[in-house]
Amino acid sequence: MGKVIGIDLGTTNSAMAVYEGNEAKIIANKEGKNTTPSIVAFTDKGEILVGESAKRQAVTNPEKTIYSIKRIMGLMFNEDKAKEAEKRLPYKIVDRNGACAIEISGKVYTPQEISAKILMKLKEDAESYLGESVTEAVITVPAYFNDSQRKATKEAGTIAGLNVLRIINEPTSAALAYGLDKKESEKIMVYDLGGGTFDVTVLETGDNVVEVLATGGDAFLGGDDFDNRVIDFLASEFKSETGIEIKNDVMALQRLKEAAENAKKELSSAMETEINLPFITADATGPKHLVKKLTRAKFESLTEDLMEETISKIESVIKDAGLTKNEISEVVMVGGSTRIPKVQERVKAFINKELNKSVNPDEVVAVGASIQGGVLKGDVKDVLLLDVTPLSLGIETLGGVMTKVIDRGTTIPAKKSQVFSTAEDNQPAVSIMVLQGERELARDNKSLGKFDLQGIAPAPRGVPQIEVTFDIDANGILTVSAQDKNTGKSQEIKISGSSGLSDSEIEKMVKDAELHKEEDARKKEVIEARNHADSLAHQTQKSLDEHKTNLNENDANEIQNAINALKDCIKNDNATKAELEDKTKALAQAAQKLGEAMANKNNAEQPKKKDDDVIDAEVE
């Protein structure tokens, strides 16, 4: 096994590191820099440029210069985030089999292919630095990347000629780099605000163990969004002065983007900067120039809501970890956007302690990835990394209920099985709807995928045993399988494509779960009462039909009337839990005479003992 490199494949910049000689070292690229712009350009001469060379020619070649490709990695074309990206990015985003892709000079490229070109550049530079072939890597992703985004990242590595040993979360990687030498137990928070994504993770480190307690974030919140606020401001000011909508000109838009990014960086050390873009456009009256002063205060007012969004996520993640702010020992700042003074100020004010700036925000994630590479290779001993799944996973069961199989915050890798059954007599197949979220009802959660298990042997409802297994690997990629324990027939699905969750949906699910907790609980109680009533009505009707001759006519009619009354109540969508329970109780009392008659005739069936494994829920 050769050297394993750790790669931080960023939205704006990428970095790489290697673990050798008992320490992690950043690998400089061929240009001598520790970070490489995540930019790919296609020239008119057919040349493909990556990194600094691609960035330098972006203004003159905006439609063929691809940046922020990570923002559409694993996205479906019809998703709102894809439409937002399409408005912001100068290159053409197209639909390829339902997924986002880009078109350059009539040729379609997937985000994986573009990302692979960046990874190839990193791989070649690492080989030049190390003097040997590199074939294996650990690549980092935002903590809230969904399954399809993680899968796409792994595919990009494969295209680049890398065997991706592990996909790990960026803040977890940063914590690994920070906490490797910590002997005393500490609860740390990693605040990771990069070019395109935001993650916040609370971890416990100490004695060579890094354990994630809770994680949250937004895969569509980062430095790009801060830049876009400046772009919108400059374009609006220019339009009010000249009447020209400058954002319709892709070359002018690229110049605006670069100016906005530079202004943001300058305002990290200066209180005011001037944006000067001569000959930005022209109209019938002649050329137009854009000259505008931007103060730090104005920049902060333009981006205040973005900063506050990160603070609200910090609050929820600390709560999810079961901690208070006072229990956080250290706050580690990661990502280039954490250099913004107001970001530091707001985080410090919220946590009420000094921020730890001992790590290089651009390099620490790659360093952590290289340490994980060292762990996998065996060079780093006795280090345990425990990451978690961000949301609960389960399936839809009878009545539209979400039955959880793996709870949010479960340490990965994880594998868990539950046994379900059928909802109808002689049901030949079951449909397994895989869900992700925190709500009680299936329709309020995210559908990840659906598959059918066919060929179930004819049997009364509730008799077949369908074992459903959820298996999340160390990369956070999910596989779900179902097996008929009687026939041995099985089916599985690897969640991918349109099944992924957008981060805004995840955040909305968590918030909705809190807002609707009591309402959801009430609805679930009604559904459970209805399911119990339906089961009793079905079983009693079956027994009555078989043993009616053992009853006098009045008793038989009384039981049948109670069954009919309960069935009418079940059919009433507005029936309350109390009404269902009353009718169920009435039938149970009436059915006692049936039980007595059956016992007297010695025809009673011994109730079948339930398997301890079987969950009292049915699959439609």
Curated annotation (Swiss-Prot):
Recorded name of the encoding gene: dnaK
The protein's role, per its UniProt record: Acts as a chaperone.
Classification via PANTHER family: HEAT SHOCK PROTEIN 70KDA
Family named by the database record: Belongs to the heat shock protein 70 family.
UniProt protein name: Chaperone protein DnaK
A GO molecular function held by the record: ATP binding
Entry-annotated residues carrying Phosphothreonine: T197
Classification via CDD domains: ASKHA_NBD_HSP70_DnaK-like
InterPro entries in the cross-refs: ATPase_NBD, Chaperone_DnaK, Heat_shock_70_CS, HSP70_C_sf, HSP70_peptide-bd_sf, Hsp_70_fam
